[in-house]
Each structure stands twice: as structure tokens, then as C-alpha cells.
Curated annotation (Swiss-Prot):
Regulatory component of the Usp12-46 deubiquitylase complex. activates deubiquitination by increasing the catalytic turnover without increasing the affinity of deubiquitinating enzymes for the substrate. The complex deubiquitylates the wg/wingless-signaling receptor arr/arrow, which stabilizes the receptor and increases its concentration at the cell surface; this enhances the sensitivity of cells to wg/wingless-signal stimulation. WD repeats lie at residues 26-65, 71-110, 113-152, 164-203, 206-245, 248-287, 290-329, 350-389. Keywords: Repeat, Ubl conjugation pathway, WD repeat. Catalytic component of the Usp12-46 deubiquitylase complex consisting of Usp12-46, Wdr20 and Uaf1; regulatory subunit that, together wtih Wdr20, stabilizes Usp12-46. The Usp12-46 deubiquitylase complex associates with arr/arrow; the interaction leads to deubiquitination and stabilization of arr/arrow. This is WD repeat-containing protein 48 homolog. It comes from Drosophila ananassae. One of its GO terms (biological process) is double-strand break repair via homologous recombination. Residues 591-615 are annotated as: Disordered. PROSITE patterns: WD_REPEATS_1 (PS00678), WD_REPEATS_2 (PS50082), WD_REPEATS_REGION (PS50294). Belongs to the WD repeat WDR48 family. The gene is Uaf1. The keyword Secreted does not apply. One of its GO terms (molecular function) is ubiquitin binding.
Length: 667
């Protein structure tokens, strides 16, 4: 017996968020699973965009959307309705199993027992028991009545474990009375347990590839399986063997649906076909339809005259089922058996487009995306908004047009797995505090022309995402307005923010606007990593990144005897005009007119006291900097020169020379 608790061990963490609309009424990626509540006509769909949506299938209107159920942050792989439609259980690639109030659409509790993707669920209606399984090779049994009674104070639940699986589990099935549970895995075999005793009773061999879908007969005597090997097999558990192999698909069988009398199989395949087959006589089969993409799941409509189907695409379609009629009178007076016409599209729930391509622009603030409908969009990562809808334009041309010759370090990564842009901030391979820029470049709308402020993109964004969070242990006198936000901008309050282990499990998910809540604030205190609280709560400034470089005279200098080569260190965002000022003031000992800001020998704070009336030209108009035989733009910063011009792993090297209209000896 294992015990689940909500506390988490402290591990390396990352923060991610999704740039999206406040309400996403359409699936933005494939749909993995369906559940129909025949009592009220509600269809529940589990999306690869991490959202469960509810649809009204009784209306003939195109607007079937009822609500979204959001708390996962990765593919939702399977769902089951239980308790006569009052509750719903979901399984996700975020490694969690969640319990939902199906009527109101909110998450009641989260189970974190699995250690990897949770791929499949099975439900025993008569016992109100659910089983979950996934890539961690584990199967857990849950009492639904216990799960639905969990509260913030009563948050511990006991589960039974079915052991023995040696590979990742992709399919799971149970009969209504809960006497048999079957799993299918990449072992290519079926394992059978008695969930009442948690004892394994047998394993069945026959498939040659992963077992992707399973159905158990109500009496628990038969199992039908579909495999990536393209076959459907019928198994007799009493005889412990395969009694029939059905070949009706050209590629893997990913979804199965049985008729109530367990005589007809409806199968959906990677070959995009949905086929009805008589189990006792597989030659009696009928193509229902050819879908637009590989079929992921199937489910009956209310009166079972049609079947809802989902695919890799985001649309959900209902197809009319053909019926097998054994009582058709032929011309000679005998009886023939034939299929009635099916395959008509009865309804369609349209989905949205999934983002398939993404380019981070050189300024490391904007990304350009292209979706499955060839629509190109520009997103502002810093402000967490869609900036511009460009339409069906040339994607590569737009990237080229908008990319500036500027280098800013990577400070985030983009994940497109859900079909929407998920931005990931961390401290591992990519440091989210790496991007220091001038406020003029990063936030031109906030520029004060009398100052030269440097801003850190990662710091500003974290402060905006957690603007509403006030830790409980902060003294009241410290909680003034200056402690909240970044002072420049806010991000959309509907933005989901996710704290997760690096390369692993989700620990906390909340919306920006909800961070002020008591439970959310407590959860943030328990889960937010130190590098987040340092900048958001303690208001610490991230460290500047520095670049070493050499400075030497150009061969064309009028004083060739000056050959000294100086090694300097400066903040990487220092502009080359500061290097020009340093050359004039410290190397050539000339009077300068600073272009603003400060610089000293290390170029951190350069400020010349010499500002005579006879030297009014700024340094960049009197000094040329060269790198790799290229004249350097004084507006470039050091990191941009190193990336685009120097292009070497060795220390950056500048050569300087005076322009023709300036003689440093003529002071």
C-alpha cells in the first residue's frame, strides 16, 4: 500500500507560462480521449493542449462549447466519467491524475503518485474504482468516493499498487464489476490482474508491437486488444489464449469501441480509417469513414447511431454508423445479410490551429510562429501577449525582415508541445537572468532621456508574473505598493504560471491573478525556488555578465610606436561608444564629450571630467573601433560584436584609430 501526500521534495525548479487568450474555446492540438454523459448530452474531450473541454451535443448549433476544465499543463491522455457524471478523473503527461467536479468544471484534487507520464485510466462503474497507469510501469487503484472527499486539510489518500509490469504501459481496461483489469504495454503482451486481491493472474502473448487499446467484456471473460502491429486480437481469459486475430487495418490500431452485446468492433487506426467488424465473422466489415489524420479515440453519440472520433487534428467529428442487417429479403425469397449505408458526417466540433514552428528573434523579446493553418503571428514574450497577426505570409521572409543585427543571450526557451507557446524560465542550460539591455532598447515607451538605465528581462517578467503574491511571513510594514510588480508593465491576469521540476513533474499551477489567494500564496512559499524569491520578494539585482577583451592601436595609427595591448573587462551590454570614450580619455589622454553614462578603466562607470569647449565632438566621431577588419558601429554592445563580428572562442580584440578630422596631439 502506498500513501499519497501533497508535499514535494525540493528539487531544481523551472517556471513556465503560456501566452494565450483568456478563454480558449477550441482545441489547439489533437484530442486524446472522449467521454459522453448520455444523461445530459455533454461530451468531454481531453486535449493535447492540456485542456479538457465540455460540449453540448444536443444542440444543432455550431456553438457547442460549454466550458473548459483547466489545471493540467501537458497533454491530457485519458479521462473517465464517474459517480453518474458528477465527477471526472483525468490522466496527463504532467505525471498527475486529477479529480474534477464535472458539473462546475473545477479541479478538486491532484494525485502525484506517478513518476512519469500517466497514459491510461480504467473504470469499474459498479465499484466506483479507477485505475491509472503510465510510462513509470506502475498501476495504481483508487477508490473514487475517497478521492472526491479530499480537502485541503484531508489531503492524504491510500492507493493499492499492481506490480509486475516491465515496460511502459499505454493501455488499461477494467470490467464494470471490477473483477478483471488488463494492461497493454511496449512488452507487446497483455497482463491480467484481479483488482480485488491485486494479484496478477496471467499474461498473454501474441502481439508483436505495443498494445495501444483494450476492452474487457462485462462478464470479464473476453478481452479485445488493438496493437501498433495493425491487428485486433480477441482473447479468452478462461482458456488463456488468443482465439481470433482480425486484420482490417494497414497500420496500428489505436482505438477500440464495442457494441453493447460485444459482437461488433469499431476500430480506429493510424491509417485514418474507422471500420466496423463483426467479431464472430471478420469478413463482415464496413468502412465507416476515412478521417483526415490518424484516429486517437472513439465514443458513441447519445443514441449510438453514430460515433464521435478524434484525431491528431483538433476537430471532433461524429460519423453515422452502418448497421448490419441479417433480415433482408433477396430476389429468390431467401434472407441476405448486408450493411446499411453509414459514413455520413453527423456533426463537427471545429478545432483551432496548433503552432508548429517558432523562431526567437535576435532581440530575444519577440518570437514569430507559424501554425497548422499557415498563419504567422508575432508574440511579445516580455509582456506575454500576441503582438501582431500577420496572416498567411512568407514565414522565413518575416523572420529575416524582423531580425536585427543585435545579440542578446538566450534567457528563455519555447515549448510548442501543447500547440500554444509555452515559455520556460530556469537556471540550468539557459539562465533567465542572462538578458541585460538598456531601457531604451527594451522598453522604449518607458524611456527617460536623462537617464541610462539597464533592465533585466527575466527579473521584470518574474516580477510581473508574481505581482499579486505577498508571502504570509512578510511584515505588514514591508508590504507597500513598491514591493509589487516591476514598475513598468503588467501581464494578462489570466496567464497560467507553472512551477515544475526540471525535466520532471509539475508542482504548482496557478493564474497570475490568483497568486494573492491564501492557498496559492502558501503553495508558492513552499514551491518557489530561491532564485525566484531573490528577485521577486527580496528585490535582489541579478549579476551582470562580463566580457574580457583586448584593446590595441590600429596599424594605421599616426603613432606606430604605441603598440601596447591592454586587457580590459566590461559588462557585456556596454556599447562600443564607451570603449571609444575610454580610448580618448585613458589611452590618448584627450578631452572628451561623453555620450552619457559613466566609464572607468574597467568600463563599468566611465565619466570624463574633461569637457572643454574645444572638444565638443562625441568620442565615437573622433575614434574608430575595428574588429576583424570591420569598422564597428558605436551603438553595438560588446556581446553583439563578439557574436556577429569576432566569431571566435578567444577573447574579443579591438583595434582603435583616430579619424582624419581629429589629431590627439593637437590639444
Amino acid at each position: 500500500m502506498l500513501t499519497h501526500k501533497t508535499c514535494q521534495a525540493r528539487k531544481k525548479m523551472q517556471v513556465s507560462f503560456v501566452i494565450r487568450d483568456a478563454e480558449e474555446k477550441q482545441h489547439r492540438n489533437g484530442v486524446n480521449a472522449l467521454q459522453l454523459d448520455a444523461n445530459n448530452g455533454k461530451l468531454y474531450s481531453a486535449g493535447r493542449d492540456a485542456i479538457i473541454r465540455v460540449w453540448n451535443t444536443r444542440t444543432e448549433s455550431n456553438e457547442k462549447y460549454i466550458q473548459s476544465m483547466e489545471h493540467h499543463n501537458d497533454w491530457v491522455n485519458d479521462i473517465v466519467l464517474c459517480c453518474n457524471g458528477r465527477n471526472l478523473i483525468s490522466a496527463s503527461c504532467d505525471t498527475t491524475v486529477k479529480v474534477w467536479n464535472a458539473q462546475k468544471g473545477f479541479c478538486m484534487s491532484t494525485l502525484r503518485t506517478h513518476r512519469d507520464y500517466v497514459q491510461a485510466l480504467a473504470y469499474a462503474k459498479d465499484r466506483e474504482q479507477v485505475a491509472s497507469a503510465g510510462l513509470d510501469k506502475a498501476i495504481f487503484l483508487w477508490d473514487v468516493n475517497t478521492l472526491t472527499a479530499l480537502t485541503a486539510s484531508n489531503n492524504t489518500v491510500t492507493t493499492s499498487s499492481l506490480t509486475g509490469s516491465k515496460d511502459s504501459i499505454y493501455s488499461l481496461a477494467m470490467n464494470p464489476s471490477g473483477t478483471v483489469i488488463v494492461s497493454g504495454s511496449t512488452e507487446n503482451i497483455l497482463r491480467i490482474w484481479d483488482p480485488r486481491t491485486c494479484m496478477r493472474s496471467m499474461k498473454l502473448r501474441g502481439h508483436t508491437e505495443n498494445v495501444r487499446c483494450l476492452v474487457v467484456s462485462p462478464d470479464g471473460n473476453q478481452v479485445v486488444s488493438g496493437s501498433s502491429d495493425g491487428t485486433i486480437k480477441v482473447w479468452n481469459l478462461g482458456q488463456q489464449r488468443c482465439v481470433q486475430t482480425i486484420h482490417v487495418h494497414k497500420e496500428g490500431v489505436w482505438s477500440l469501441l464495442m457494441s453493447e452485446n460485444f459482437q461488433y468492433i469499431i476500430s480506429g487506426s493510424r491509417d485514418r480509417n474507422i471500420i466496423v467488424t463483426e467479431m464472430r465473422n471478420p469478413s463482415n466489415k464496413m468502412l465507416v469513414c476515412e478521417e483526415q489524420a490518424p484516429v486517437l479515440s472513439l465514443g458513441y453519440n447519445i443514441d449510438k447511431t453514430g460515433v464521435w472520433a478524434t484525431t491528431w487534428n483538433s476537430d471532433i467529428r461524429c460519423w453515422k454508423l452502418p448497421m448490419y442487417d441479417r433480415c433482408t429479403l433477396n430476389s429468390s425469397g431467401g434472407l441476405d445479410a448486408q450493411w446499411t449505408q453509414g459514413g455520413t458526417e453527423l456533426a463537427c466540433i471545429k478545432g483551432g490551429a496548433a503552432i508548429k514552428e517558432c523562431t526567437v528573434l535576435n532581440d530575444k523579446r519577440y518570437i514569430i510562429t507559424k501554425d497548422s493553418q499557415d498563419q504567422v503571428v508575432v508574440y511579445d514574450v516580455l509582456r506575454v501577449v500576441k503582438k501582431e497577426q500577420l496572416g498567411a505570409v512568407d514565414y522565413e521572409a518575416e523572420v529575416k525582415k524582423r531580425n536585427k543585427q543585435v545579440y542578446i543571450p538566450n534567457w528563455f526557451t519555447v515549448d510548442l508541445k501543447t500547440g500554444m507557446p509555452t515559455i520556460v524560465l530556469g537556471q540550468e542550460e539557459v539562465d533567465c537572468f542572462a538578458a541585460w539591455v538598456s531601457i531604451e532598447a527594451g522598453l522604449p515607451e518607458c524611456v527617460d532621456p536623462t537617464t541610462e538605465i539597464k533592465i533585466n528581462y527575466g527579473k521584470l517578467l518574474l516580477e510581473a508574473l508574481l505581482e499579486h503574491w505577498t508571502p504570509h511571513n512578510m511584515p505588514p510594514n514591508d508590504m507597500d505598493q513598491d514591493m509589487h510588480g516591476n514598475g513598468y508593465f503588467q501581464v494578462p491576469k489570466h496567464t497560467p504560471v507553472i512551477f515544475s521540476e526540471v525535466g520532471g513533474r509539475t508542482v504548482c499551477r496557478l493564474l497570475v491573478r490568483d497568486a494573492a489567494g491564501d492557498s496559492e500564496s502558501t503553495l508558492l512559499q513552499e514551491t518557489a525556488p530561491q532564485w525566484v524569491t531573490d528577485v521577486v520578494i527580496e528585490k535582489n539585482i541579478p549579476k551582470f555578465l562580463k566580457i574580457p577583451f583586448f584593446l590595441q592601436p590600429h596599424p594605421q595609427m599616426t603613432k606606430p610606436e604605441r603598440t601596447k595591448k591592454d586587457r580590459l573587462v566590461a559588462n557585456e551590454f556596454i556599447q562600443c561608444r564607451k570603449v571609444c570614450e575610454h580610448v580618448l580619455e585613458k589611452v590618448l589622454n584627450a578631452e572628451t564629450t561623453p555620450s552619457g553614462g559613466n566609464a572607468n578603466n574597467s568600463l563599468q562607470n566611465s565619466q570624463s571630467d574633461a569637457n572643454s569647449e574645444g572638444s565638443q565632438l562625441p568620442a565615437e566621431e573622433r575614434i574608430e573601433l575595428w574588429c576583424n577588419d570591420v569598422v564597428v558601429d558605436p551603438n553595438m554592445d560588446l556581446r553583439t560584436v563578439r557574436h556577429f563580428i569576432w566569431k571566435q572562442s578567444t577573447d574579443l580584440t579591438f583595434q582603435y584609430k583616430t579619424k582624419q578630422n581629429f589629431n590627439y596631439d593637437g590639444k
